Amino acid sequence: MPGHGAWVASNEPPGAVHRVAWMDQVVAPFSAGRTCGGNGAADPVRVSVHEALAYLHSLKQFGFQPGLETTRRMAAAAGNPERRLRFIHVAGTNGKGSVCAYLDAIYRAAGLRTGLYTSPHLVRFGERIQVSRSPLSDADLARHVGELRAMVETLPGLVPTFFEFTTILALRVFAEAGVELVLWETGLGGRLDSTNIVSPLASVITNVGLDHQQVLGATLAQIAVEKAGIIKAGVPVVTGADDPDARAIIEFRARELDAPVLGVGAPEVAMLKDPVGLVGPHQKSNAAVAAATVRLLRALIPVSDSQLREGLASVRWPGRLQEVRRGNQSLWLDGAHNLPGVLALKAALPDVMPVGRPALVMGMLADKDWPTMARILAPLASRIVVVPVPSSRTVSTEALRSAAIAAGAGRPVRAAGSLSEALRWVTADPVVLITGSLYLIGEAVTLLGLESSAGDGERTLNEWSPPGTLPPA
């Protein structure tokens, strides 16, 4: 496994903090006029949502720093809100957000007030933290960030990362809202992930695949060790992992901790003869993992078969093989952003596009296995438009275009300067697939004028007609 130093994505020693001038400008609104109350804690300052978001993004310079000490210190200073909550903790290379969405829909169908913590967001930060599928409002975001920032300033030497701060923010929101169950998605890995400070009712490991190898390890076995790090003593485990080595590691760790392991069984297979709300064989697998988790916890949280079916059928999770109609044109948005995700997308396409090939609009990040991803996707398309992803980590359109030409078996390939330009180029194509990065899907959701976190009673991506942002097909 990688040593501790290999986990820090910079040349600084582990835990080092490099403060830059622009950060002082960003956080100034949080410090201006700050006084301390009688208990020694800094009084919160009113900040705007723009100031709150600027502060949150300033924390991204500290990258990913593995370990739980900072998160535990923050949780203790905040009064350990996690101790007042019940959790289902979900890890996995792919599908963990979808499994959380299925579980959230099922337990809401059973009448529970739920908390949903996932990442990343597509458009708005509040999508990460939802109470009964209502995203955190801008006003509540600003209030909580101001209060939590004030608290952090009282803790000597503590400089949280973006995800550490966001995790404690979520715990505060859920405790204040009085949610009855939290669907709690890991950020990266599991063992050293900030979410791993909780004691859940169940631990779920959806699957294990190759992603984030520079952090989690180069092999499936190494990555499985990190995912299995969420397993707690005596807490049951549900897994859909089918790789033999990964499954063996998960089961070995569970035995060490006297944690029973449950896989997908006959009841879930029978249940999945009914329709589910998300598209593709991989989403059937995710639904089965969610259903197995519900079955495991029925003694603690009763859920009827009809409520389970209702939740599975009603779930919405934008950007996961979701269809947008634009006149007679179908645009499919899928956030496949790593090799396992692209393989799952390829397997699902015959179900949603049984005739013909789509025009493919794709952009990818440079720290993924993008050459292999492009090699898999290019032959599936009628023609290809490559675009930059709205991230500093984007693959250049020149490099991605070359990879697509090499793999595309003579299909036309163009490079667009932006996604909006690419969408104008494909207005005449009856079917368009946009994929390669969740950041790209977030940009598409914005351009198409869609609501990115549809809950019950709202129009889903399947039902939206874009409000004139782009010319009709």
Please report, for each region that a protein language model flagged, where it lies by residue.
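N-terminal leader/targeting and accessory segments in enzymes
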Residues: G5-P13, V17-N94, S98-R113, L122-V123, ...
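ATP-dependent carboxylate-amine ligase catalytic core
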Residues: D43-R46, F62-F64, L68-R84, A109-V198, ...
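Nucleotide phosphate-binding/pyrophosphate-handling subdomain across enzymes
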Residues: R84, L181-T186, D193-V204, V208-G209, ...
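Hydrophobic alpha-helical packing residues
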Residues: L103-R108, F174, L377, A404
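Conserved catalytic-core segment of NTP-binding enzymes
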Residues: G187-S194, V198-D258, L360, W370-T372
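C-terminal helical cap/extension that packs against the catalytic core
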Residues: G240-L262, R295, S330-L333, L339, ...
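Short, flexible loop segments at boundaries between secondary-structure elements
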Residues: V389-S391, G455-A473
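A glycine-rich beta-strand to alpha-helix segment
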Residues: A422-L450
